[in-house]
From Swiss-Prot:
HAMAP family, per the entry: TSR3 (MF_01116)
Disulfide bonds: none
A Pfam match: Ribo_biogen_C
GO terms (BP aspect): enzyme-directed rRNA pseudouridine synthesis
Chain residue ranges for the region called Disordered: 1-25, 247-323
Keyword terms, alphabetized: Cytoplasm, Phosphoprotein, Ribosome biogenesis, rRNA processing, S-adenosyl-L-methionine, Transferase
Gene source species: Mus musculus
Record-given protein name: 18S rRNA aminocarboxypropyltransferase
Top-level EC class: transferase
Cellular-component GO terms for this entry: cytoplasm
Length: 323
């Protein structure tokens, strides 16, 4: 009187394509190339309401927690296009899982794992990591992404603040399936910018053999960026002795030599005036008028130097106001 045992294989798989476990990497690479060719066909790009994009040769999944704006969430867009499958919070994923709680970096050593079981990401807000129940999103192969720079409009230029599609693309590039990254990034106008922005780093990571070498490549890159720190310069500091130029305005190339010539000329003129004053002082060295003239001749260079300094400062202030 027990329940009738259902024959194996009679259940329908809901939206899942079961791949043979013994598929070789060469066969997988051929499927990747076919998927790329199908994705670049003009008919697929123009007909958004057609049969949908070509199926990817590996499974893509995500745990969606509802932290992000649905209109900006790249993971939800991929799910609407049928490229990514949404998982329940407590559902297990057997492939590679990109998670902040991972202990190893993604590396080319994960190539076979990705080809056989796919990749999953966690769609959560970077501002709510402490409130995200990572322990409920179960997986056997948790991985971290190395240092990369985001190209999405929300976090452009920020290191490690990648969106879902950028995380998928980074993992595919590192394990050696860059065509899959191109297929996903083509769905976004800014997608190509992610590959251009991180080309050097992605090539370094893809040339590694394991997670340890990926870590060394990351540390080497970060060390090289710290070796050349940017100099902190205040362009409004008039006492710094530096000359600054407004790049939005043309600057005459003869301006600096003219100023130098004028300065030299003024110095020569001051020296001539000092000699003339000395000659005038010689006829009456002991008179009261001679003493006053002598003291005035000593103070004149200092007064002229102070006048030049105040004039230069005033020019700098006027130039800053004009700019």
């Amino acid at each position: 009187m027990g329940r009738k045992k259902v024959a194996r294989g009679s259940r329908k798989e809901s939206g899942r394509v079961r791949r043979p476990s013994g598929r070789s990497l060469d066969a997988f690479a051929e499927e990747v190339g076919a998927a790329l060719r199908a994705s670049v066909q003009p008919e697929e790009a123009e007909d958004q309401g057609g049969p949908g994009p070509a199926a990817l040769p590996c499974a893509l999944a995500m745990w969606e927690l509802g932290h992000c704006d649905p209109k900006r969430c790249t993971g939800r867009k991929l799910a609407r296009l049928g490229l990514v499958r949404c998982l329940r919070l407590s559902q297990r994923f057997g492939g590679l899982v990109l998670s902040p709680v991972g202990t190893e970096y993604v590396s080319p050593a994960d190539r076979q794992l990705v080809a056989q079981s796919g990749v999953a990401v966690i769609d959560c807000s970077w501002a709510k990591l402490d409130d995200t129940p990572f322990q409920k999103m179960r997986g056997s192969h948790l991985r971290l992404l190395p240092y990369l720079v985001a190209a999405n409009p929300v976090n452009y230029g920020r290191p490690c603040k990648l969106s879902c599609v950028e995380a998928f693309a980074a993992a595919f590039c590192i394990v050696g399936f860059s065509d899959l990254a191109v297929i996903l990034l083509r769905k976004f106008k800014w997608g190509k910018g992610f590959l251009d922005l991180n080309r050097e780093l992605l090539d370094k990571y893809a040339a590694c053999r394991g997670p340890e070498e990926v870590l060394q490549a990351e540390q080497g890159y970060l060390a090289s960026t710290r070796d050349t720190p940017e100099e902190d310069i205040d362009p409004f500091d008039v006492d710094s002795g530096r000359e600054f130029v407004n790049l939005n305005r043309p600057v005459a190339s003869t301006r600096l030599p003219e100023d130098m010539d004028d300065t030299d000329g003024s110095e020569e003129h001051s020296e001539d005036s000092e000699e003339d004053s000395d000659e005038c002082e010689e006829p009456g060295p002991g008179a009261n008028g001679g003493d006053s003239n002598y003291s005035g001749a000593e103070e004149t260079p200092e007064q002229e130097a102070q006048a030049r300094d105040s004039t230069e400062i005033w020019k700098g202030i006027k130039k800053r106001q004009r700019d």
